[in-house]
Amino acid sequence: MTETANLFFLGAAGGVEWGTVIVQVLTFIVLLALLKKFAWGPLKDVMDKRERDINRDIDDAEQAKLNAQKLEEENKQKLKETQEEVQKILEDAKVQARQQQEQIIHEANVRANGMIETAQSEINSQKERAIADINNQVSELSVLIASKVLRKEISEQDQKALVDKYLKEAGDK
């Protein structure tokens, strides 16, 4: 069995043809050199270019992610500022509405007080006129009664003086 293995390794003729082995080794080396120059070099260049493209795409993606995060932060800040501004506008509107309400109530009170004062002065003036009318009627009635009592007629001027005198005496009591 060892002999069969030796025949297999040594070749069928039983000897190694070193010329063929050297030619095959040289052919293999030339083939490797040609592959390196014409296949491995361009293939390596393509792989290097692809690696650079992938790295550039990764860098671009990271930059885009950073830009997106920055934009998101800016949008959050703008949203916060907008919400604060809306809140301030609402608060200002509430304050202004309260002020307008107070002003309207104040103006209504001023008008109501003015109307009350006008009504009171009108009432007082009508009261004074009514009192004056009553005084005139009382004086006329007093003169009439006095003239009937005395059964004599006195002048109108004397009657008024007499009534005024009685009214003054009645007012003093």
From Swiss-Prot:
Keywords: ATP synthesis, Cell membrane, CF(0), Hydrogen ion transport, Ion transport, Membrane, Transmembrane, Transmembrane helix, Transport. CDD domains: ATP-synt_Fo_b. Coiled coil: none annotated. The keyword Transmembrane applies. One of its GO terms (cellular component) is proton-transporting ATP synthase complex. It is found in: Cell membrane. GO terms for molecular function: proton-transporting ATP synthase activity, rotational mechanism; proton-transporting ATPase activity, rotational mechanism. The chain crosses the membrane at residues 15-35. It is a single-pass membrane protein. Its main location: membrane. The keyword Transmembrane applies. PANTHER family: ATP SYNTHASE SUBUNIT B (PTHR33445:SF1), ATP SYNTHASE SUBUNIT B', CHLOROPLASTIC (PTHR33445). F-type ATPases have 2 components, F(1) - the catalytic core - and F(0) - the membrane proton channel. F(1) has five subunits: alpha(3), beta(3), gamma(1), delta(1), epsilon(1). F(0) has three main subunits: a(1), b(2) and c(10-14). The alpha and beta chains form an alternating ring which encloses part of the gamma chain. F(1) is attached to F(0) by a central stalk formed by the gamma and epsilon chains, while a peripheral stalk is formed by the delta and b chains. F(1)F(0) ATP synthase produces ATP from ADP in the presence of a proton or sodium gradient. F-type ATPases consist of two structural domains, F(1) containing the extramembraneous catalytic core and F(0) containing the membrane proton channel, linked together by a central stalk and a peripheral stalk. During catalysis, ATP synthesis in the catalytic domain of F(1) is coupled via a rotary mechanism of the central stalk subunits to proton translocation. Belongs to the ATPase B chain family. This is ATP synthase subunit b.
